[in-house]
Amino acid sequence: MLVIGAGQAGLAAGYFLRHTNLRFQLVDAAPEIGHVWQTRYDSLRLFTPAKRNALPGLPFPGDPEHYPGKDDVAGYLRAYARTFALPVQLATRVTRLHARDGTFTAVTDRGALRARQVVIAVGAFGVPFIPPFARHLDPGVLQLHSSAYRHPAQLPAGRVLVVGCGNSGAQIAEELTRTHQVTVALGRRQPRLPQRLLGRDIFDWSDRVRLFDRSVDTPLGAFLRGHDPLIGTNLTARKLKVRPRVTGAVGRVVHFEDGTVASFGAVVWATGYRGGYAWLDLPVLNDRGEPLHARGVTSVPGVYFLGLSWQHTRSSALLGGVGRDAEYLAERIFEEHHRRSARDG
């Protein structure tokens, strides 16, 4: 049994695989557990309180009502792997995964690994996406994807454009208003929820209607997926300008959907990620390179995905939610293992 990825999804898978008594191995390209979190922007704070950020079996340390930073999360993941003695092989990048005669082979930069079942747990963040027209910006305009942003000092003084505004983009834009003249370009207006309401975290209130536990195949889940709210951020109350979608760029000038233009000295592309599954030599992706699955179970027996955005619910890619999907997949893996064992005799 091979688990590719040792972030929060892979570690949660390892926890439940321990309970199946199946032999398994986790591999990860990073030099240490929690590396992806440590390389995020310095001011990152989770929008879920610590009490909602626990993987199965280990509470998140500290005040249950505080909002952890990126280093807190990285440290927690390392402690989690130690606590449950999970078998993690680091600095091992999988460059190809293919199948032959019912066995999967993961080609890595440290040799080949073979398994009868594979969990692909590389997470919701694939390859950073920047629109193709960004190449038409003048070389003098500093461009950063949000994955490469660390702090305001990276950017030259003056006017900054933040393109795209999920929760990370909103946090970055808020931070930059203290040091720069900030414009935010929004593809669409997003619903906003306060971080706290009447003295309680918004997630405490949402529990009453199980808002973030609605599956993607329900009407409310489908609506939420298309209207993911910003939490704890009110951009209109900040010292920044809000523009519509960016449609193009030439030189130092950016064009917006409403026909207006403006020039900037720097652009932060908070435009998300794309698949990053080019190494998968298996029929488990659609024509856009996205995983084909039903709650992580693919049409190829023995191949599973874990940690995807909206894999089952809004919480699927969150620290406090991935465990439910991991438990579900561990049960399916155990069932498939026994079916195969019975068939093979």
Which ranges hold each PLM region?
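Flavin (primarily FAD) cofactor-binding/catalytic cores of flavoenzymes
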Residues: 1-30, 34-36, 65-167, 171-345
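Short, flexible, mixed-charge acidic loops at enzyme active sites
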Residues: 42-54, 199-201
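Glycine-rich flavin
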Residues: 49-64, 212-213
